[in-house]
UniProtKB/Swiss-Prot annotation:
The keyword Hydrolase applies. The gene is acyP. This is Acylphosphatase. The active site is at R23, N41. GO terms for molecular function: acylphosphatase activity. It is an enzyme of class 3 (hydrolase).
Amino acid sequence: MDKETLRALHVIVKGRVQGVGFRYWTRSLAKSLNVKGRVRNLADYSVEIIAEADTDTLGEFVYALKHEHPYARVESLNSEEVRARGYTDFRIEV
């Protein structure tokens, strides 16, 4: 993907998103959509995601984060565009 089409989002997901496999599901979703970046749990029980892809793919990714996990209950999802770092994969950080 070239630099003109690559976008990056910093996402904070709040709700019942820890202890339900959300990070592993997010990584699987990202790999299926060819999204690059990372996901990690935060101390306040939210989940932080950095995601890089084209605009349409990021839209699909964010929609799925909000609506498609079978056990999570997303109460809020906040995202902001950030500078792309050029991730080469999608990983879970601890």
